[in-house]
Amino acid sequence: MTKQRILFITTGGTIASVHTPQGLRPVLSSDELLAHLPELNDLCIPETLALCSIDSTDLGQEHWLMMARAIQENYALYDGFIICHGTDTLAYSAAALSYLIQNADKPIILTGAQQPLSNEITDAKKNLRDSVICALDPGSRGVMVVFGGHVIAGTRAKKNKTISYDAFASVNFPELALVQGDRLVRYVPSPWPTGPVEFGRAMNPRVFLLKLIPGMDPGMIPEIFRLYDCVIVESFGVGGIPQRLMDAFAEGLGHYEQTHKVLILTTQVTYEGSDVGVYEVGKRVKNRFRFLEAHDMTIEAVVTKSMWLLAQNCDSFDQLQQRFYRQVNFDTFYH
């Protein structure tokens, strides 16, 4: 049987780092990464593309667009893509690529490591090998995260451990599969494309994430609305916002009503999502504002979906709302 061609796209991160007097620094080239795993040649035809070599905390919208463009330019040449990425912002990149690359009929996998590949004891080799096993499975399609043996939809991944090897969890949705040795045990089928693969070319970075704290001074809220096109509010519980903060939100939205500013409400709680209408404090919000509610979506998905949608120049709030709730790569089950 003909071996499949897999393109490894490297971006830096812990997996490509070595110890220096200044701390871990990503310096390994893409070819040096694969040199640590010669056994991959028995599974596939691995080739490499070095996109950048930076700490993932320095990654942003321009890098997500670079990743999408690199996959677009090589899409016809390879059977699958594995992006080696730092763990700190990997979930953001996975969500962003889920929106920037839709209807993919090939696997696009993000992985990384908690310990550098150059270490004697590391999770990097397992994660890279597991990613190849997942990529070679004929049922693998679209953007996903492979880490610690777990396969997670790109819009549902969240880093919830800073040191442990099982660093990522699937939030409010089952894991897609598990990698057990050379076998992929699938729980959820990958979504079938509804048309030809589509690549996005723009994201609007003017999105602000505001985490509420008890007793927060509302004075900065109108200024936030002045500077940003979309404000995502991490409310308390299922969707509570203090009364004095609501007054500030009303001022901010009212002042910029004609400029299509967007307010999105979500929750600080990782699991089970928001439901603004449950309590009186939430119902006050519903009666006073025009907003989108994130419901079961992860913060990473809400942030990147907002950036993607705002770059599409929706004609009205209703159109934006319709697109926001359209499911992409299992990101939401609210209709």
State the predicted function of each range:
Residues M1-E73, Y271:
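ATP/NTP phosphate-donor binding region
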Residues T2-R5, I9-S17, S29-L40, A153-V238, ...:
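Accessory alpha-helical/coil subdomains and C-terminal extensions
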Residues H19-Q22, A94-A95, E120-D123, A153-K159, ...:
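Short acidic, glycine/serine/threonine-rich loops at helix termini
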Residues Y78-L90, L227-G239:
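Short acidic, glycine-rich surface-loop motifs adjacent to enzyme active sites
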Residues C84-K106, Q243-E251:
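Short Gly/Thr/Asp-enriched flexible loops that form oxyanion-binding sites at enzyme active sites
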Residues A94-D123, V132-P138, H255-T267:
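Short, acidic/small-residue loops that bind anionic groups at enzyme active sites
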Residues L110-Q180:
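Internal gly/pro-rich beta-alpha loop/helix module
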Residues V238-H335:
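C-terminal non-catalytic interaction/assembly regions of soluble proteins
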